[in-house]
Amino acid sequence: MAQYHQQHEMKQTMAETQYVTAPPPMGYPVMMKDSPQTVQPPHEGQSKGSGGFLRGCLAAMCCCCVLDCVF
């Protein structure tokens, strides 16, 4: 009977403890509760139809042709 009371008390104290986590690595962005939310500017990328994919394919084909002629 004494063993039952010891196990019951141990389970109760384990449930009441707070869990602690490790701090994030250095340089990792951390959001503070008191700091205001920062608004990031919109991403300025290339517009559609700029031909990036087509230019890359043509450059690859030219490289293949040059390598074919050389070897």
UniProtKB/Swiss-Prot annotation:
Q: Which residues cross the membrane?
A: 48-64
Record's family? Belongs to the CYSTM1 family.
Gene (UniProt): CYSTM3
**Effects seen without this gene:** Increased tolerance to high salinity with reduced reactive oxygen species (ROS) levels and associated with an over-activation of nuclear salt stress-responsive genes.
Keywords recorded for this protein, A-Z: Cell membrane, Cytoplasm, Membrane, Mitochondrion, Transmembrane, Transmembrane helix
Write down what this protein is called.
Answer: Protein CYSTEINE-RICH TRANSMEMBRANE MODULE 3
Tell me, how does this one assemble? Heterodimers. Interacts with CYSTM7 and WIH1/CYSTM13.
Where in the body, by tissue, does this protein show up?
Answer: Mostly expressed in leaves and flowers and, to a lower extent, in stems, siliques, shoots and roots.
**GO term, biological process aspect, one:** sodium ion homeostasis
Q: Which domain of life does this protein belong to?
A: Eukaryota
